[in-house]
Amino acid sequence: PLGNGFAMEPDTPTLLLAGGMGIVPFVGYVSEHPKPWNVTMLFGHREPLSCYPVDSINEHVPLDSLRETVPGDLDNFIFTIQERMREYAEQKGLILACGPLPFLKTVHGFARELNARVQLSLENRMACGVGACLGCVTRTTGEWPVADKRHGLVQTCNHGPVFWANQIEL
């Protein structure tokens, strides 16, 4: 409801990466996407699929669900994320990610390594929601628009919660 949402580029192959409850923002995204056949989702989770709104996504886009049930599953999921991101980076696709901070840090690292076009939806605590308290700041990189440097910090509630991975530090 606050700030900026994910980019929607209908003619660009788009990979959605969701970790746990990070699947929620993608429900609206896939239902509004004009070319859902150009979108794929990779979803990692610990709880059974019945805990997540997968039916409303699965009717629009292909969903690869990887459930963590034993310790080795997490390594497999991370490897799968990296391989999928590599595929989409090579074809200049768009990669969108939402999930817990450790998940986003992993995606952020791969985005830099692959020089991929990636947007991350951050789950910062937003106390006031209007930019007055500065409680939700995110550190920026040198890629942040020059006219809007803000001393290396931006408010997630106003300038996010979705950011290009190359413009922020995690």
Regions found by a protein language model. Give the residues of each.
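FNR/FR-type flavoprotein reductase catalytic core
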Residues: 1-127
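Glycine-rich, flexible loop/turn motifs
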Residues: 2-4, 118, 153, 158-159, ...
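Local cysteine-cluster metal-coordination motifs and their immediate loop/turn environment
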Residues: 25, 101, 123-161
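Short acidic, glycine/serine/threonine-rich loops at helix termini
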Residues: 54, 131, 168
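Iron-sulfur (Fe-S) cluster-binding modules
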Residues: 92, 166-170
